[in-house]
């Protein structure tokens, strides 16, 4: 007769393995959640297993079971984020953003939802809102350990922050963000961001320098950037009146 403890040990190993996979992906929002309720954590792991396999309906059902056990803000923020993740995996972008916003309002230190909210606001030309989200995402990234910190994402976030600050005419802050971006791997087309910033600051020499950088690294953006920076420098661009 088989020893039933073998099955128990296998299940426990699978559970620990699943937790570690999800912790690596979502650690800053997952680890503080449901610390005092291991049964709910098991339910959450199960929900995340389904969500990761794009079995969104089952994942959402399990999240609904978890909801009554959300006691602390850490529980509520994680729950709202994972509801947003369900909608994201299901292709429902508006609902995804709505729930990521709710998670942010409760408060958490996971960069990813803030970055997604920043990019959505940026694409909608809501530059002030995007700036705030980029700054929060950067703060969360900087709080991570050196081993976990993603330098490519940090460089991209700082470059996009530069763009938003430029569009709301906060040029000293934009230049500081641009200088911070230079500490990380260069982003494709980043010279376009710098060219626009320096054109807005009236620095034709630095604008030309970054357009030359574009010619070498990202020629597809040269014509559009030259046109925009030319308008900015001449005072004819509507977003940058003299």
Regions found by a protein language model. Give the residues of each.
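Flexible helix-coil transition and linker loops at the boundaries of alpha-helical arrays
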Residues: 24-36, 67-76, 140-151
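Short coil turns that delineate tetratricopeptide repeat
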Residues: 71-74, 108, 142, 185-186, ...
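Start-of-helix register in tetratricopeptide repeats
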Residues: 41, 75-78, 112, 149-152, ...
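Terminal, low-structured helical/coil segments at or just beyond the last alpha-helical repeat
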Residues: 208-242
């Amino acid at each position: 007769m088989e020893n039933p403890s073998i099955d128990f040990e296998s299940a426990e190993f699978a559970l620990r393995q699943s937790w570690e996979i999800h912790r690596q992906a979502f650690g800053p929002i997952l680890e503080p959640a449901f610390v005092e309720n291991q049964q709910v954590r098991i339910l959450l792991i199960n929900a995340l297993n389904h969500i990761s396999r794009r079995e969104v309906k089952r994942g959402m059902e399990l999240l609904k079971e978890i909801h009554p056990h959300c006691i602390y803000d850490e529980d509520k923020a994680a729950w709202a984020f994972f509801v947003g993740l369900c909608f994201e995996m299901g292709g429902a972008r508006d609902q995804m953003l709505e729930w990521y916003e709710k998670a942010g309002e409760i408060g958490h230190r996971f960069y990813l939802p803030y970055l997604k909210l920043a990019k959505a606001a940026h694409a909608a030309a809501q530059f002030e809102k995007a700036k705030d989200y980029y700054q929060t995402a950067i703060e969360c990234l900087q709080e991570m350990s050196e081993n976990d910190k993603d330098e490519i994402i940090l460089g991209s976030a700082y470059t996009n922050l530069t763009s938003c600050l430029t569009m709301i005419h906060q040029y000293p802050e934009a230049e500081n963000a641009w200088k911070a971006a230079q500490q990380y791997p260069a982003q494709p087309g980043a010279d376009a961001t710098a060219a626009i910033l320096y054109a807005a600051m009236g620095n034709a020499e630095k604008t030309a320098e970054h357009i030359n950088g574009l010619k070498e690294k990202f020629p597809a953006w040269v014509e559009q950037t030259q046109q925009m920076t030319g308008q900015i420098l001449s005072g004819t661009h509507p977003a940058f009146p003299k």
